[in-house]
Regions:
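Extended amphipathic, helix-rich lipid-handling scaffolds
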Residues: 1-21, 31-46, 55-196
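Exposed regions on extracellular, virion, or secretory-pathway luminal proteins
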Residues: 23-26
């Protein structure tokens, strides 16, 4: 048994690079942390319970790559290159029964050109339900606010659970083009007719 408990008072990171390659997998993740600080961490390895009171990641970049997946134009979740990252977490906790996360600010830019100027909100998930009570996201062109509660069995064929979503969004053409990619000509023609 691993009965270690690690208490972290304050951790500051500057000009730090982290690389991760999964064994028996082609997945590659690289994080560049120019300036970050973690306050109030508690890690119970026996109970697999982890919490952080505050995280301020002021500048950095992340590369996430699955090299054997075909690359596509636009936003490509198999080949992410995120830059200008700044993330503020007010609280984070995880154990096998529940996950809680509160993001107070988030900015980043993807290689596709998609740029998030502001994002944040709370997120909670347990073995039964996922909750997103106050999510918001803004780009230079678009805005989105959402509230969602979803039972994890919401899409079961038999006795499905509930999904409640309240969405208020204004999505602009430049963001859709950045997400879909300029090579997606059929979608661009449809967008041009929609916005005309």
């Amino acid at each position: 048994k691993n009965e270690w408990k690690i208490k972290l008072l304050n951790l500051k990171m500057k000009r730090t690079n982290v690389q991760l390659r999964m064994p028996h997998d082609s997945l590659f993740v690289k994080a560049q942390i120019t300036d970050a600080e973690v306050i109030g961490g508690l890690f119970d390895l026996l109970r697999k319970s982890y919490s952080v009171r505050q995280l301020d990641w002021k500048e950095g970049a992340v590369k996430y790559d699955r090299p054997f997946e075909t690359a596509k134009r636009g936003f490509d979740y198999n080949h992410l290159q995120l830059s200008q990252i700044a993330i503020g977490v007010d609280s984070f906790s995880y154990n096998p029964e529940k996950l809680n996360l509160k993001i107070i600010y988030c900015t980043l830019q993807d290689k596709s050109g998609l740029k998030i100027q502001r994002a944040g909100g709370s997120f909670a998930m347990d073995s039964m339900q996922m909750q997103l009570p106050n999510f918001f996201l803004e780009t230079p062109y678009s805005k989105l606010k959402a509230r969602m509660t979803m039972d994890l069995n919401a899409f079961n064929e038999r006795n499905p659970g509930k999904l409640n979503l309240a969405l208020n969004a204004s999505i602009a053409k430049p963001d859709l083009i950045a997400y879909l990619g300029p090579a997606n000509s059929a979608a661009i023609v449809l967008l041009n007719s929609f916005y005309a």
